[in-house]
Amino acid sequence: MVSGLTVAEIRKLAGSRAGLDEDFLRALACDKRAGVAEIYRRLKRDENKMAAEAERLQKLYIYENSLIAQGYSPVAGVDEAGRGPLAGPVVAAAVILPPVADLALAGLNDSKKLNPSKRAELAARIKKVALAWSAGISTVEEIFNENIHAASLTAMRRAVLKLKIRPAYLLVDGYRISRLELPQLALTGGDGLSASVAAASILAKVLRDRLMDFYHVQYPQYGFNRHKGYATPEHLAALERYGPCPLHRAGYRPVKNCGSRQKCEG
């Protein structure tokens, strides 16, 4: 099967992943050429990695599969991003994934464990694979008026209500969502335990980061595009120098300690 091919031709074929069935791999294993042996070892390593990733993804569906087996379908995962920053809104997302683990979502994980480029890549894939997804936002004013916990729940509630498919059950990171008549399970560390919650955490984080990049254009002196509103030394120094702007959370102590909001209005 491969004896009539050069090592370069086999390498090109392996790179394209075309026709890489078990017969092809067995033929590579029997080929005595050193170059072919190296190609075979690389393909087997890749195969083993994909098998391990498929197993890891399947474990992330334990909660979803259990609920579906009990008759709850579809299941939505819900999470938020932006509880801790000194500036900007809190953003939530709700995601309904297909009931079967999909290697198109290889690398799916808690958004905090992924770098920005990986999060953006996965967010695009999640939107393609998901049966439904949506986002909800609570503004800086709502955070001030309600407190951050209540505002986070409001953002999550909005995300759920915007889903085009009504979920039968919710898996929520951290806390149950009040004033929502749907059965739900709050999972501590849910973005590392549930595929749909992990997907929601990624969408919420990517959307919020993009909003903060947009706000950076309006208020470049704070560096929102770098720290996304969190209390980094750069951000605290900018607050001390310029005072708060309308995006800052007036109820947060570091913001209150930096003087009048009027310094940066407009």
Swiss-Prot record:
Binding site residues for a divalent metal cation: D79, E80, D173
Pfam families referenced in this protein's UniProt entry, alphabetically: RNase_HII
Subcellular location: Cytoplasm
Coiled coil: none
Keyword set, alphabetical order: Cytoplasm, Endonuclease, Hydrolase, Manganese, Metal-binding, Nuclease
Annotated GO MF terms: manganese ion binding; RNA binding; RNA-DNA hybrid ribonuclease activity
Gene3D superfamilies cross-referenced by the UniProt entry: Ribonuclease H-like superfamily/Ribonuclease H (3.30.420.10)
GO terms (BP aspect): DNA replication, removal of RNA primer; mismatch repair
Cofactor notes: Manganese or magnesium. Binds 1 divalent metal ion per monomer in the absence of substrate. May bind a second metal ion after substrate binding.
UniProt EC number: 3.1.26.4
Reported cofactor(s): Mn(2+); Mg(2+)
Recorded family membership: Belongs to the RNase HII family.
PANTHER family hit by this protein: RIBONUCLEASE H2 SUBUNIT A (PTHR10954), RIBONUCLEASE HII (PTHR10954:SF18)
Name of this protein: Ribonuclease HII
Organism: Pelotomaculum thermopropionicum (strain DSM 13744 / JCM 10971 / SI)
GN (gene name): rnhB
